[in-house]
UniProtKB/Swiss-Prot annotation:
Pfam families: RecR_C, RecR_HhH, RecR_ZnF, Toprim_4
Zinc finger (C4-type): 57-72
Keywords: DNA damage, DNA recombination, DNA repair, Metal-binding, Zinc, Zinc-finger
Swiss-Prot/TrEMBL GO biological process terms: DNA recombination; DNA repair
PANTHER family (alphabetical): RECOMBINATION PROTEIN RECR
Provenance organism: Paraburkholderia phymatum (strain DSM 17167 / CIP 108236 / LMG 21445 / STM815) (Burkholderia phymatum)
UniProt superkingdom: Bacteria
Annotated coiled-coil segments of the chain: none
Protein name per the record: Recombination protein RecR
Keyword Metal-binding in annotation: yes
Function: May play a role in DNA repair. It seems to be involved in an RecBC-independent recombinational process of DNA repair. It may act with RecF and RecO.
InterPro entries xrefs: DNA_Rcmb_RecR, Rcmb_RecR, Rcmb_RecR_Znf, TOPRIM_dom, TOPRIM_RecR
């Protein structure tokens, strides 16, 4: 039996979400249609509202409803410090630590040549323009510690250092509350290499 075309279209749309395969998308679609049509309508309205009202901040590239986001508009922030992150979700995580008082630049991805993601796709030119505006003194690279994140940090670091900026990278090591017995060898090795005096 063939699915109705409207249901097939819904399943395909749900598959666009990260980590959602055909079976999960089908389960979600059937759940929404069988048990939560009101929730489905709310989801549809919310998606439409977000696509119509969210844009990229002109300065840092994160999502905002205004031309300039709240963080970039905050005069209490230190404009000489710029933290580079891969996604708005990474920016939110750093904000939750309440340890960063500088500004941000959100790449909206990371370098991944095999996936066709190069400097243009991560807004490299905008980052360089922002970092070399004469105000920024230090750039903190807070990309993830994946192969792509490391490659992105290396590429950005080399380019920004060649323009006279101080470039630092987030430290790595044993997590707070972590026991050495349960931490992988690579993390312990990096923590040992990045040790500091007390």
């Amino acid at each position: 039996m063939k699915q109705p075309s409207a249901l097939s279209a819904l399943v395909e749309a749900l598959r666009a979400l990260p980590g959602v395969g055909p079976k999960s998308a089908q389960r979600m679609a059937y759940h929404l249609m069988q048990h939560d049509r009101e929730g489905a309508e709310k989801l549809g309205r919310s998606l439409l509202f977000a696509t119509e009202h969210l844009q990229h901040c002109e300065k840092c590239n994160t999502f905002t409803e205004a031309q300039i986001c709240e963080v970039c508009s905050d005069t209490e922030r230190d404009p000489t410090l710029l933290c580079v992150v891969e996604t708005p979700a990474d920016q939110i995580m750093l904000e939750q630590t309440m340890t960063w008082r500088g500004l941000y630049f959100v790449l909206m991805g990371r370098l991944s040549p095999l996936d066709g993601i190069g400097p243009k796709e991560i807004h490299f030119d905008r980052l360089v323009k922002r970092a070399t505006d004469g105000v920024v003194k230090e750039v903190v690279l807070a990309t993830n510690f994946t192969n792509e994140g490391e490659a992105t940090a290396h590429y950005l670091g080399q380019t920004l250092k060649s323009r006279g900026l101080s470039v630092t990278r987030l430290a790595r090591g044993v997590p707070v509350g972590g026991e050495l017995e349960y931490v992988d060898a690579g993390t312990i090795a990096r923590a040992m290499l990045d040790r500091r005096s007390i």
